[in-house]
């Protein structure tokens, strides 16, 4: 599995780029405190070559960190399942790293999976780094409603997140299970999120 970019443009693709104020040099923000961004730059010519070779070699394409334009380049120029390894629902949290409902449907429609991200700034309605299990459950419910029972897995991003974390590390994952149960997820839905959906994609692709 490989993502085509991180937080900066490279020779393959671009992320959503924060828009800077011409006067102050700072990043412009919306009313919820999220950075405004330019989503228009997608894959480069080399990026299009890479995704073709990745599919030929059986590699899984990861669209987390890609710009919106890059996401739709993947949709239009590939045929196999792809993943968003650590992204949430933009409808519930306006951060540019999250997926719109149309994106969630596109991942699900291709048979891919989205990894639920535990970072507070990707979970909350405002730019707040406090990571709460209740917000994880809310994003999970929304993504299942939009994309169906097969679209969601786990993408905690423990190695890259900070802030006040209700789940500190993988030894505390039972807190997520209990939170999903409190939010009335079924046992089958929870099993799908914990491992079945991701394993399905791996077995199909690898």
PLM ranges: what are they?
Residues 12-14, 92-99:
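Short, charged, surface-exposed secondary-structure boundary motifs
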Residues 5-9, 59, 64-69, 87-90, ...:
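Active-site beta-loop-alpha junctions enriched in small/polar residues
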Residues 168-206:
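Mid-to-C-terminal alpha-helical segments outside catalytic/metal-binding sites
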Residues 108, 113-123, 127:
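A conserved active-site cap/scaffold subdomain adjacent to cofactor or substrate pockets
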Residues 61, 86, 114, 157, ...:
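Conserved, mostly hydrophobic/aromatic
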Residues 18-83, 96-110, 134-150:
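Histidine/acidic residue-rich metal-binding segments in metalloenzymes
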Residues 117-118, 147-170:
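Short acidic/histidine-rich active-site segments
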